[in-house]
Amino acid sequence: MLRPITRTLSSSARITRSLPSSLISARARGVPIDVHPEVEQALVEHLPLVALETTIVTHGMPYPVNLETARSVERHVRSVGAVPATIGIIGGRVKIGLESAQLEYLAESRTNPGPVKLSRRDIAAAIALKKDGGTTCSATLIFAALAGIKVLAGLMS
């Protein structure tokens, strides 16, 4: 008697299959992209996401006002039922969604004096040179689109 073959997918395989194909393809090609677990879960569950740029954190305001502003915007996004996906580059790796310590690292110019302002033209060089940087709206939009995030909010100083 033949038994049906059943295959159980691991939870990571189920998650991967639910992510946007552009993000899966970029990861498969070795693009250095890290998606925060909360953002990845929101993508899988089709929860509302808002992409946030980080240039205002790295270049727009002095510390600690820059950090307080970024955290305030993230809290506001959460208060309306969405998940914030603050986007930046750290050590040449694209971060879609930042940990609190990563956001502070980009904001604190005394401990990290070298973050660059990253527009779309600067992305490849920042990755190749393993730089840290705050993404402008144009660079943030590229990564948001890659991840399937349809809403972008820019911070204003």
What are these regions (language model features)?
Residues 19-28, 48-60:
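Generic N-terminal amphipathic, Lys/Arg-enriched alpha-helix
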Residues 128-157:
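Glycine-rich anion/phosphate-binding loop at the beta-strand->alpha-helix junction
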